[in-house]
Regions:
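Alpha-helical transmembrane segments and their immediate juxtamembrane cytosolic regions
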Residues: 1-353
Length: 353
């Protein structure tokens, strides 16, 4: 199944080239035609494998798991962000997509708490919840949709209204030709004049509707962009209290809030989640994969200057640039099941060793 995404614009293979020689344009042509390259499913599976290695390090670090295992996980979030951008762009129902991620976010948050209460393994702290990051990303992408709807070219509704009025006048003029005979020309002029006057108020009304729509969509976009930040403010009074100052009631209220609140303050990858709306906004530009990779590289450079190993996220651009626009295998619910399952299994195993 193809997904219509603006992948790299490529030329066809050089037909005049010598036999057996693969030109760069021919390579990109084959990637785009799905004979080479990676599908959405392939990129997701690369992320899953790297994620498991990273979480092995997380759960078994106190048992001597080498620190370099953590490096494998640095591109993972970026790969999942990219897959989410593609998925949100092509889903049949964005609302259902968001609801599904939100439910998984809450379930994963509850599972983290239950595992730590029941297993009580001190070697790893469970804060894993990629679903929260992805759901926050969908809020931001919905904001981008609002801005795109507000600022895209609507077409000249006033002109179309004017044209409709003139055509209406012509039709009325045509009937006048049959009735009035020799006064047809005068009727035509009068009819057109009346239609123009009738069209002008409709034209102004269409313009006001368009302006109102744009204002509405712009406001919706701003509110959606601000929402994950505003929801973070709800948590601050609880987090300001020291561990010893929190009552049992406050602790449980905080646990409930952290389960249901899509606050960017709680995101596993914090502000890196902002990569999602950036990549989403770039999805339809020419050479979109290149520009999305540039955005990733900019963030990676920032982490490099900060001295953090997260700069290794730059390696995510390799599979992203090889994306061929194909969906690949379905397995719609695989990740929703595998992610919490592998966290639980690794956490329990680590507690038993």
């Amino acid at each position: 199944m193809k997904e219509n995404i603006n992948v790299m614009n490529v030329n066809t293979a050089n037909r005049s080239g010598r036999s057996g020689t693969m030109t760069s344009s021919g390579l990109w042509s084959k990637i785009r035609s799905h004979r080479l390259g990676l599908s959405t499913f392939d990129i997701k599976m690369i992320g899953v494998v790297l994620m498991v290695v990273d979480h092995i390090h997380q759960m078994f670090a106190t048992q001597g798991a080498p620190n370099w295992l953590d490096w494998f996980g640095r591109p993972v979030a970026t790969l999942f962000f990219f897959v989410s951008v593609v998925g949100f762009s092509h889903t049949h129902s964005k609302k259902a997509y968001m609801v599904r991620l939100y439910v998984c976010m809450v379930v994963m948050a509850v599972l983290d708490v239950v595992l730590q209460q029941v297993v009580n393994y001190d070697g790893a702290q469970l804060v894993n919840n990629i679903f929260r990051d992805l759901f926050i990303g969908t809020i931001f992408m919905a904001a981008v949709d609002c801005f795109e709807a507000a600022f895209k070219k609507q077409g000249n509704k006033a002109a179309s209204g004017f044209g409709a009025g003139v055509r209406g006048g012509d039709e009325r003029t045509g009937s006048a030709h049959g009735v009035m005979g020799r006064n047809a020309v005068a009727a035509s002029v009068d009819g057109a004049s009346v239609s123009v006057q009738a069209a002008m108020p409709a034209s102004r009304h269409a313009g006001s509707v368009t302006r109102g729509f744009r204002v509405k969509k712009t406001v919706e976009g701003v509110l959606l962009l601000a929402l994950p930040f505003l929801l973070s403010l709800v948590l601050l009074p609880f987090m300001a209290q020291g561990d010893g100052a929190q009552t049992p009631v406050m602790i449980w209220v905080l646990r409930v809030l952290t389960a249901v609140d899509p606050a960017i303050l709680l995101a596993e990858n914090t502000v890196m989640v902002l990569l999602i709306p950036v990549m989403y906004a770039l999805r339809n530009v020419k050479h979109s994969l290149v520009w999305q990779s540039v955005a990733i590289a900019v963030v990676a450079v920032c982490y490099a200057f900060a001295g953090q190993t997260q700069w290794m996220m730059i390696f995510a651009v390799i599979p992203i640039l090889l994306y061929n626009g194909a969906k690949g295998r379905g397995d719609k619910y695989f990740f929703y099941i595998f992610y919490p399952a592998h966290i639980a299994v690794l956490y329990v195993l680590a507690s038993l060793i």
